């Protein structure tokens, strides 16, 4: 029994030295990573940086756009229902209330 194990190890040892990449063929480390860094560098230069540039252009063009008029207030019965007051402030304003954009149940505060 011991001689069979010894002979098997003698046969497998040279194979392991000759083919180191085939030792664990299903592991993720078996594949070469020489192209991985080059791929991520190319993605950074050709996808990410132009994407940031397009986003900056979009913000610039939107900032130069004229202001729109506020739509007239229509008191729809299914919107802005207050069954109990909010636990902050006067209880009628939402947490991130903007008086120029968000109307109260009675209308805009500015009008």
From Swiss-Prot:
PROSITE patterns: COX6A (PS01329). Residues 27-36 are mitochondrial matrix. SUPFAM superfamilies: Mitochondrial cytochrome c oxidase subunit VIa (SSF81411). Component of the cytochrome c oxidase (complex IV, CIV), a multisubunit enzyme composed of 14 subunits. The complex is composed of a catalytic core of 3 subunits MT-CO1, MT-CO2 and MT-CO3, encoded in the mitochondrial DNA, and 11 supernumerary subunits COX4I, COX5A, COX5B, COX6A, COX6B, COX6C, COX7A, COX7B, COX7C, COX8 and NDUFA4, which are encoded in the nuclear genome. It is a single-pass membrane protein. Belongs to the cytochrome c oxidase subunit 6A family. This is Cytochrome c oxidase subunit 6A1, mitochondrial. Residues 62-111 are mitochondrial intermembrane. It comes from Mus musculus (Mouse). PANTHER family: CYTOCHROME C OXIDASE POLYPEPTIDE VIA, CYTOCHROME C OXIDASE SUBUNIT 6A1, MITOCHONDRIAL. It is found in: Mitochondrion inner membrane. InterPro entries: Cyt_c_oxidase_su6a (IPR001349), Cyt_c_oxidase_su6a_CS (IPR018507), Cyt_c_oxidase_su6a_sf (IPR036418). CDD domains: Cyt_c_Oxidase_VIa. The chain crosses the membrane at residues 37-61.
């Amino acid at each position: 029994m011991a001689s069979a194990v010894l002979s098997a190890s003698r046969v497998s040892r040279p194979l392991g030295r000759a083919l180191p990449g085939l030792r664990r063929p299903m592991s993720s480390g078996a594949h070469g990573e020489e192209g991985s860094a080059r791929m991520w560098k190319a993605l950074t230069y050709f996808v990410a940086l132009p994407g940031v540039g397009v986003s900056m252009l979009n913000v610039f063009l939107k900032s130069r756009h004229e202001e729109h008029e506020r739509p007239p207030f229509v008191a729809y019965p299914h919107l802005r229902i207050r069954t109990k007051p909010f636990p902050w402030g006067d209880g009628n304003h939402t947490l991130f209330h903007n008086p120029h954009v968000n109307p109260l149940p009675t209308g805009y505060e500015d009008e």
